[in-house]
Curated annotation (Swiss-Prot):
Residue ranges, annotated region (Disordered): 381-413
Pfam families for the chain: PI3K_1B_p101 (PF10486)
Topology in membrane: Peripheral membrane protein
Its biological purpose: Regulatory subunit of the PI3K gamma complex. Required for recruitment of the catalytic subunit to the plasma membrane via interaction with beta-gamma G protein dimers. Required for G protein-mediated activation of PIK3CG.
Activity-regulation annotation: Greatly activated by G gamma proteins.
Protein name (database record): Phosphoinositide 3-kinase regulatory subunit 5
GO biological process per UniProt: G protein-coupled receptor signaling pathway; phosphatidylinositol 3-kinase/protein kinase B signal transduction; phosphatidylinositol metabolic process; positive regulation of MAP kinase activity; positive regulation of phosphatidylinositol 3-kinase/protein kinase B signal transduction
Written domain comment of the UniProt record: The heterodimerization region allows the binding to the catalytic subunit.
Length: 871
């Protein structure tokens, strides 16, 4: 009976795996239905987690599928299989000593190194991940949980914070309830330490570790004792992962952990003679903060600094970092800040001198990035920054070796001689910097010029422009941040690219998860552009966090029925736990929201099939299904080991943990000229509506006024005479300009790629939709109407001018709050990074002379996906 049961289990797991991979090829668009496919991955994880032995069965079948992929050359399945293998190894309780699964996996993925990018990059990271697991079993699990829970361990101080941003008026109540549950504190620090120690000992000793007895022993310990045991365990694992020989590393780690257990008072629990039973230890829920967000800025993210300042503040330094600080103490005030995003070194230098006080000093923060398969960002990010290579990693000790004391890197002696030979001009510059610094009042509050968040009852006069700080978006929040956080980084701090693949390996990670439709994606693009501009002049968030943006599409709620969910419309406070009612648009005197598209998420799904399956597919299921928990009761014997979450919460955490490759979405800018002659520049990412379509959206959003104004379609709209100048890009990089005059009711711009066959990474374009009036009929007895025709043109730049200064309306990204009236001129072009933002827009319309540097400086919004843009 036992072999039959095993065969049945293998068949069930194999069937669940095939369902996960079904329809993932790029030619998969023939299927007219997709509802329920997003649950296949969750169902597979649920099935495997019921028994610790199921993980090894699934890993065997994943490797068999991967070998078939290599033989058949089916590129599309490699990334999903690698992700499934990684997540399964992460949750596997223990690999038996006689198991060769990881060695077979290393041999299998080594054969894919000759495949094109990103497949070779995925396999290279898989090999690094497998090597670490072979030497120190369970180390990837430890690193992930340690970072997500914010547990500092001496030199390993990396932290991962997840922030959920959603608009409660537009998102369904079920999504709000799930977000509120994720942001509710789960395990206590005592419980987290216990879980990590249980996992570490079981991963090393396997069934020979009496886990229930060890659990009771750990629960009787104080949190200080658990922290000491956890610190020794972590140091041992990190050192073992750096040993060259796999067998030597595993044996040394086993001996070291056994010594740690004996020291902690665990006799007869570790390495028992008779094997017991393995237990599945799920990953604890990550720390999450939930905020109500409906702004065009990420000012709210700075509240994370207030919550995480205990982890970010200086205090625990490694030996090498303390020596570097001593070596470079004499350089603390010399040389201007060369910010990685600065538009001008002079502006950056001035802002540094104004904000530095004599007491402000910031040692290098000690952090370590999660070095796993999903750790790095892909190549080709929009940073354009390359930093000098430098040996900055701590080499692990060999077994039996003494702890390194006073060791310095080989280049430090040369650096000391270099500092002694510096010219006296830098000493003069340093004295000048100190004199300027001493002249600044350290108690002067930081304010942004013209900030709308400034208190109205402040009687003090605004400081002069030279004394204002343009670094922080909110004055109130600025006064709450500690002085060490606001101080400019010292000269010796290693510069870190902004959202780049060259991130500092010790940086903490800030996951920003945004829920919404294309309207919200436009807000994300505008907030991202402002964030880059602010971080250019005075980096705050990017000094401590590596930013990652995640996008979860949802259907826009019409708000026609009251929903029971937490109530707080504050933009600067997390959603509370009390159950009240959010006001709907009707309660606010507004019309119900008009439907918004989800073209951005569909575009991401075309580029990454695993994103389409596991993230975009959530939109096709009813919210009540996504909020259900597992039908199987939790039978885990360890109390408090994990908290059961709804399906939606599990999928959100899966997306945040395993999506590590960004897709770059081109951001566009439009310069608008009004009837009064004033000009303004706005940002959009998906669509721009002009004329009757924008006016109609404004009328629908006007609340009670929509009944009085009425809504006409394009056949009854008043036509506009427009001069349209557009540029059609070519693969060669040349542009062909056209100038025409049209009588139109509406002119719309949207992202060109709507079908899989239109995917082409070398051609980023917009679709110009012209609703042209062919003939206007004005009968005497009835209202006039138009005979219209619609044409589509792919463009990369366009200029629209109202004839005889005829005004029109413009709407950005289907946002009712971004409708601008009385516009007479609209110029649209790709948006550049802040370094290129000073270029006059007219240059792009006069002579389309483009250089390679301009093409590299385009501003793109990076949205995290699982595999990035597949070729």
């Amino acid at each position: 009976m036992q072999p039959a049961a095993t065969t049945c289990t293998e068949d069930r797991i194999q069937h669940a795996l095939e369902r996960c991979l079904h329809g993932l090829s790029l030619g998969r668009r023939s299927a007219p239905w997709s509802a329920g496919l997003c649950l296949n991955c969750w169902s597979l994880q649920e099935l495997v987690s019921r028994d610790p032995g199921h993980f090894l069965i699934l890993l065997e079948q994943i490797l068999q599928k991967t070998q078939e992929v290599q033989e058949k050359g089916t590129y599309d399945l490699l990334a999903p299989l690698a992700l499934l293998f990684y997540s399964t190894v992460l949750c596997t309780p223990h690999f038996p000593p006689d198991s060769d699964l990881l060695l077979k996996a290393a041999s299998t993925y080594h054969c894919f190194l000759t495949w094109p990018v990103p497949y070779c990059s995925i396999c290279r990271e898989m090999l690094t991940f497998i090597d670490a697991e072979l030497k120190a079993p369970g180390i990837s699990y430890q690193r992930l949980v340690r970072a997500e829970q914010g547990l500092p361990v001496r030199s390993h101080r990396s932290s991962t914070v997840t922030v959920l941003l959603l608009n409660p008026v537009e998102v369904q109540a079920e999504f709000l309830a799930v977000a509120d549950k994720l942001s509710t504190p789960g395990q206590s620090p005592h419980g987290t330490y216990t879980t990590l120690l249980l996992h570490a000992f079981q991963a090393t000793f396997g069934a020979h570790c009496d886990l229930p007895k060890l659990h009771r022993k750990l629960q009787s310990k104080t949190i200080e004792e658990l922290e000491d045991i956890f610190t020794e365990t972590t140091e041992a694992q990190e050192l073992a992962s750096g040993i060259g020989d796999v067998a030597e590393a595993r044996e040394w780690l086993r001996t070291k952990l056994q010594a740690v257990g004996e020291k902690a008072g665990f006799p007869g629990i570790l390495d028992t003679a008779s094997p017991g039973k393995l237990h599945t230890i799920p990953i604890p829920v990550a720390r999450c903060y939930t905020y109500s967000w409906n702004q065009d800025s990420f000012d709210i993210l700075q509240e994370v600094l207030l919550k995480e300042q205990e982890l970010l503040q200086p205090g625990i330094l490694g030996d090498d970092e303390e020596e570097e600080e001593e070596d470079l103490e004499m350089d603390r005030h010399c040389a201007e800040r060369d910010s990685l995003l600065s538009t001008s070194s002079l502006v950056s230098h001035d802002s540094t001198l104004l904000l530095t006080s004599s007491q402000a000093s910031e040692p290098v923060l000690s952090r370590q990035m999660l070095t796993t398969f999903v750790s790095g960002l892909s190549d080709g990010m929009d940073s354009g920054y390359v930093e000098d290579s430098e040996e900055n990693s701590e080499w692990p000790q060999k077994p039996g070796s003494q702890k390194r004391q006073g060791h310095r890197r080989p280049g430090q002696k040369f650096n000391r001689f270099y500092k002694l030979l510096k010219s006296t001009s830098q000493l003069v510059l340093r004295r000048d910097s100190r004199s300027l610094e001493s002249s600044v009042d350290p108690t002067l509050p930081l304010r942004r010029a013209g900030s709308l968040c400034s208190p109205l009852d402040c009687p003090a006069q605004l400081p002069s422009r030279a004394q204002r700080s343009r670094s922080l978006p909110q004055a109130k929040l600025t006064t709450q941040l500690p002085r060490w956080l606001l101080a400019p980084p010292s000269h010796h701090q290693r510069r870190r690219p902004f959202l780049s693949g060259d991130e500092d390996p010790k940086a903490s990670t800030l996951r920003v998860v945004v829920f919404g439709s294309d309207r919200i994606s436009g807000k994300v693009a505008r907030a991202y552009s402002k964030l880059r501009r602010l971080e250019t002049s005075h980096p705050i968030l990017t000094r401590f966090f590596k930013l990652q943006f995640f996008y979860v599409p949802v259907k826009r709620s019409h708000g026609t029925s009251p929903s029971a969910c937490p109530s707080s419309l504050s933009q600067a406070s997390p959603l509370p736990a009390d159950s009240l009612k959010y006001p709907s648009p009707t309660d606010l005197g507004m019309a119900p929201w008009e439907d918004s598209t989800n073209d951005i998420s569909h575009y991401l799904g075309m580029l990454d099939p695993w994103y389409e399956r596991n993230v975009l597919g959530l939109m096709h299921l009813p919210p009540e299904v996504l909020c259900q928990q597992s039908l199987k009761a939790d039978s885990r014997p360890l109390e408090g080991s994990a908290t059961q979450l709804p399906i939606l919460a599990d999928m959100l955490l899966y997306y945040c943990r395993f999506a590590a490759r960004p897709v770059l979405l081109q951001v566009y800018q439009t310069e608008l000229t009004f009837v009064t002659g004033e000009k303004t520049t706005e940002i959009f990412i998906q669509s721009l509506e002009l004329g009757h379509s924008a006016t109609t959206r404004a009328i629908k959003a006007s609340g009670r006024g929509r009944k009085r104004l009425g809504i006409d379609d394009d056949r009854e709209a008043v036509p506009l005479t427009l001069q349209i100048i557009y540029s059609k890009g070519a693969i060669s990089g040349r542009s062909r300009w056209s100038n025409l005059e049209k009588v139109c009711t509406s002119v719309n711009l949207s992202k060109a790629c709507q079908k899989p066959e239109e995917l082409d990474s070398s051609m980023e374009a917009l679709t110009l939709t012209l609703t042209e009036v062919v003939k206007r009929q004005n009968p005497k007895s009835k209202k006039g109407f138009n005979q219209i025709s619609t044409s589509y043109i792919k463009v990369d730049k366009v200029q629209i001018i109202g004839s005889s200064s005829c005004p029109f309306a413009v709407c950005l990204d289907q946002d009712e709050r971004k409708i601008l009236q009385s516009v007479v001129r609209c110029e649209v072009s790709p948006c550049y990074k802040p370094e290129k933002s000073s270029l006059p827009p007219e240059r792009s319309f006069s002579q389309p002379a483009e250089t390679g540097s301009d093409l590299c400086s385009l501003l793109c919004l990076p949205i995290m996906t699982f595999s990035g843009a597949l070729p």
